[in-house]
């Protein structure tokens, strides 16, 4: 048997490169989570999941590691502190958490609590998010930045919050918005604290590049900024402008794009200062990316820079432009939500079954009587028996041609169902035999490099792709997926992952691999009576809130976990996933009404002797249990 180590597994899943030293594999072959990159302590994911199941918490389970979240906040702030010290930057840096990344109360609560030491702020983009921001700022003095479109009610709420004493900045996204703010300021007699969003010509890269540039959805053009300054001056509100904001997109993959935006944005700041606008803050927005695939490249699922390089470039570029222009260096704000939240959340679920040929007839005995088979099938038998490394190309090409021929002959009525089934069986056996030979050949013949895709098996996972990792479906985002056990054993299956929705789009066919993107995920054959779990990593940003209820699969169970030196871990919070009745409620159905309707019908059927009392009672009991139960699959 070929020797296999946990280092081999770490390599094929590229774990060291995307894991940010927060994930590792222990001697048991299980994935572990660390509270910080330098910590020797860890939590065994498989052991944790087993313990949760004993507590009747069923998969799929969303695990939120709050120490990891704190560590990411600390890492970003530490990088900026170092950059400020190294560059002798005379002003400050401040992190703002964009609530849209993950609005869950416990998440925002943890960020607000831990972020106190860094004077962390909250960025909001809607009225509901504004209410959340005010809630957390009450009694805590947390600063708030308001982005996005705003109506009269929104603006008036911000104005009165400002008067009461909240530190709240309202960012002007469009000229018509500024006119509303000025009118309401006059009406209420309350002076706002204003920011102006600048529409830069610089653009980001990757999936969100259109967030920047001349055609961006938000921001004022340069001519509009001049008009805004004039309008504010006329209304004696120019001194209310304390901030400028720009944003060229989420997940910026190239550091040079960030530098270009910083240079252009800081020039705007410098020119506005020269025009007499007392700006104190430059909000550089989001864009600090996450290396999802570990390639450290400019590919859309990666970034070609580190947090430290990002922070250093921000500080250096802004200082350099300000000194050149002869203006004061501003306080710097960033809204790095993705980089803050992505790593702390892991979805773990069980694999249910596979589309393998385990239950197919075994035609092994038939091989001895091949002369009685149809010619096409007989040729496949001959290839299977004689194949070796010297005839690989020819045998592979012949196999492809013969299986196509078998399908055509079956459609024309010249092959029986059993003969076509045997042809399929032989096709799989031949490909696996070829694969066994190919793995030992270097270099692999070019035409055989992609044939392994034919061997890919579909593993069905107990989750909804649309609910738990919607970006995988919507924008083809890569997320690392790794089995959380048996990593001291060599995987023996090349797989895709399908969810349990009734939708063909509910399948993942692109994965993070050793050399970047790959079309299959190495997994193990599932043993009889074995619980086999996979983890979906780096899903803490956007996925929960973007998830939808396709097939009415609801929120998963969620567990907040912190590290504990004595016991290994501590469960802080358990949030139950949606029961069936809760999912139905989202679409205006009421569980009690459904039960009553069915019960009334059952009583009529009992009276007409269509069903027995026992059958009716048992059916209603099953229906009631289903309404109260988890939307995902059990045994």
Swiss-Prot record:
Substrate binds at residues 282-292. GO terms for molecular function: arginine decarboxylase activity; metal ion binding. It catalyses: L-arginine + H(+) = agmatine + CO2. It is an enzyme of class 4 (lyase). The keyword Magnesium applies. Gene3D superfamilies: 1.10.287.3440, 1.20.58.930, Alanine racemase (3.20.20.10), Lyase, Ornithine Decarboxylase, Chain A, domain 1 (2.40.37.10). Keywords: Decarboxylase, Lyase, Magnesium, Metal-binding, Polyamine biosynthesis, Pyridoxal phosphate, Spermidine biosynthesis. Pathway: Amine and polyamine biosynthesis; agmatine biosynthesis; agmatine from L-arginine: step 1/1. Disulfide bonds: none annotated. This is Biosynthetic arginine decarboxylase. It comes from Geobacter metallireducens (strain ATCC 53774 / DSM 7210 / GS-15).
């Amino acid at each position: 048997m070929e020797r296999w180590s946990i280092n081999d597994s770490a390599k094929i899943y590229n774990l060291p490169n995307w894991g940010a030293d927060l994930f590792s594999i222990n001697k048991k072959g299980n994935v572990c989570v660390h509270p910080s990159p330098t910590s020797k302590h860890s939590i065994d994911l498989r052991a944790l999941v087993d313990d949760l199941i004993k507590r009747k918490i069923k998969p799929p389970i969303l695990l939120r590691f709050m120490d990891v979240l704190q560590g990411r906040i600390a890492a970003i702030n530490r990088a900026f502190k170092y950059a400020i010290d190294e560059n002798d930057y005379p002003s400050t840096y401040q992190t703002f958490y964009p609530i849209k990344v993950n609005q869950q109360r416990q998440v925002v609560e943890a960020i607000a609590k831990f972020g106190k030491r860094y004077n962390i702020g909250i960025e909001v983009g809607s009225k509901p998010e504004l209410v959340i921001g005010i809630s957390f700022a009450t009694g805590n003095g947390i600063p708030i930045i308001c982005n996005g479109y705003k109506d009269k009610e929104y603006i008036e709420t911000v104005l009165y919050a400002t008067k009461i004493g909240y530190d709240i900045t309202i960012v002007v996204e469009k000229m018509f918005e500024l006119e509303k703010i000025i009118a309401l300021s006059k009406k209420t007699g309350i002076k706002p604290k204003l920011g102006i969003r600048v529409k830069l010509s610089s653009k980001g890269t990757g999936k969100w590049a259109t967030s920047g540039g001349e055609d961006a959805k938000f921001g004022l053009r340069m001519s509009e900024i001049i008009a805004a300054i004039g309008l504010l001056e006329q209304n004696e509100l120019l001194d209310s402008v304390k901030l400028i904001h720009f944003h060229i997109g989420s997940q910026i993959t190239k550091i040079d794009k960030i530098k270009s935006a910083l240079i252009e944005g800081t020039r705007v700041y410098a020119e506005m200062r020269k025009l007499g606008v007392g700006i104190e803050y430059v909000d550089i927005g989001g864009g600090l990316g996450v290396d999802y695939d570990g390639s450290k490249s400019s590919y859309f699922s990666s970034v070609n820079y580190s947090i430290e390089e990002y922070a250093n470039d921000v500080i250096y570029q802004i200082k350099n432009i300000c000194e050149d222009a002869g203006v004061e260096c501003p306080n710097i704000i960033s809204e790095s939500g993705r980089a803050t939240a992505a790593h702390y959340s892991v979805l773990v679920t069980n694999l249910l079954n596979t589309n393998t040929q385990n239950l197919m007839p075994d035609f092994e005995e038939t091989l001895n009587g091949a002369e009685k088979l149809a010619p096409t099938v007989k040729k496949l038998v001959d290839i299977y028996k004689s194949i070796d490394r010297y005839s690989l190309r020819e045998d592979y090409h012949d196999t492809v041609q013969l299986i196509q021929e078998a399908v055509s002959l079956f459609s024309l009525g010249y092959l029986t169902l059993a003969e076509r089934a045997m042809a399929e069986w032989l096709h799989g056996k031949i490909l696996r035999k070829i694969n066994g030979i190919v793995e030992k050949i270097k270099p692999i013949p070019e035409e055989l490099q992609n044939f392994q895709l034919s061997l890919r098996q579909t593993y069905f996972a107990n989750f909804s792709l649309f609910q738990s990792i919607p970006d995988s479906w919507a924008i083809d985002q890569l997320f690392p997926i790794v089995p959380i056990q048996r990593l001291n054993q060599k995987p023996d299956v090349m797989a895709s992952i399908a969810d349990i929705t009734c939708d063909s789009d509910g399948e993942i066919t692109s994965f993070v691999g050793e050399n970047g993107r790959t079309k299959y995920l190495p997994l193990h054959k599932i043993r009889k009576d074995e619980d086999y779990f996979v983890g979906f990593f780096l899903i803490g940003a956007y996925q929960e809130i973007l998830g939808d209820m396709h097939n009415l699969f609801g929120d998963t169970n969620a567990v907040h976990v912190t590290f504990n030196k004595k016991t290994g871990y501590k469960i802080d919070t358990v949030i139950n996933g949606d029961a069936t009745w809760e999912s139905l409620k989202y679409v205006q159905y009421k569980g009690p009404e459904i039960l009553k309707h069915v019960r009334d019908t059952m009583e009529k059927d009992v009276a007409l002797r269509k069903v027995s009392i026992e059958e009716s009672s048992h059916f209603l009991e099953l229906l009631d249990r289903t309404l109260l139960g988890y939307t995902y699959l059990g045994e």
